[in-house]
A protein has these predicted regions:
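Short coil-to-beta transition motif at edge beta-strands of beta-rich domains
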Residues: 1-14
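Beta-strand secondary-structure signal
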Residues: 6-8, 21, 37
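Short beta-strand-centered aromatic/proline hotspots
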Residues: 17-28
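Short acidic/glycine-enriched loop/turn segments that link adjacent beta-strands
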Residues: 31-34
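Intrinsically disordered, low-complexity, charged/polar segments
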Residues: 37-65
Length: 65
């Protein structure tokens, strides 16, 4: 994963039952974990435009169409 890469964030992250596409804005690497900020293409139903993800298993690379 790298900044600027298109990804899909699992629905469990936002809790709205929808997988969200977006772009990685920042990656913070710490001793035992990485934190990834993703900006979504469209807002979640409650108006948030992104997520901070600590479980990297909840992010996958978006496949080209």
């Amino acid at each position: 994963m790298r900044v600027g890469e298109r990804v899909i964030v699992d629905a469990a992250v936002t809790g709205d039952g929808v997988h969200h596409s977006g772009v990685i804005e920042d990656i913070y690497d710490f001793a035992r974990t990485s934190i990834v900020d993703v900006h979504f293409d469209e807002p979640t139903p409650w108006g948030t435009w992104g997520a901070t993800v600590t479980n990297l298993g909840m992010i996958r690379k978006e496949e080209a169409a």
